[in-house]
C-alpha cells in the first residue's frame, strides 16, 4: 500500500511539472549593448564593436589562407558576420568621435569598411557594409551594390576625432 501511495504522489508531482510552462532565460552572446543610453555606454559599445570586428577579421584572414574545401562555407559565414558587425560599429560609433577609418587597414583587402559600399566575394555581391573585395584581396567595383547598401544602412561615418559626421550617401 505504501508503494502505491508513493507512486501516486510521484505521478501527481510529475503531472504538475508537465502542466507548468517552461521558460528559458536569454543570455546574450555579444558584449555589445544593444541600445547604449549614456555617452560612456556609447563609447564602450563602439570600442567593443571595433574589438569584436578585429577578432572576426583575424579569423576571416586565417580562413581565407586555408585551402581546405570545408573553409569555403566558414568564410562565407564570417564575411556575413563581419559585414553585420561593420554596420553595428558604424551605427554605434556615429557621433562618438571615434575614427572608423582604421578599420580599412585592419581588413587589409580581405573585407571592406564604410556604410554604403557593397562587399563582394567570388564575384557575388554581399549585403552589408564594406568596400567590394574578393577573398584573394583584389578590390572590386560594386557601385550598384553601393547604392543599395546606402539606402539600407542609412548611417553616417565618423570624421577624424571631431565628433562630426559626414553622410554616407
Curated annotation (Swiss-Prot):
Annotated region described as Disordered, given as residue ranges: 119-169
Biased composition (Polar residues): 142-152
Position of the signal peptide: 1-19
Keyword terms of this UniProt record: Repeat, Signal
Tetradecapeptide repeat copies, ranges: 114-127, 128-141
Function: This protein is one of two components of the prominent 'filler' that helps mold the shape of aeropyle crowns.
Protein name, entry field: Chorion protein E1
Species whose genome carries this gene: Antheraea polyphemus
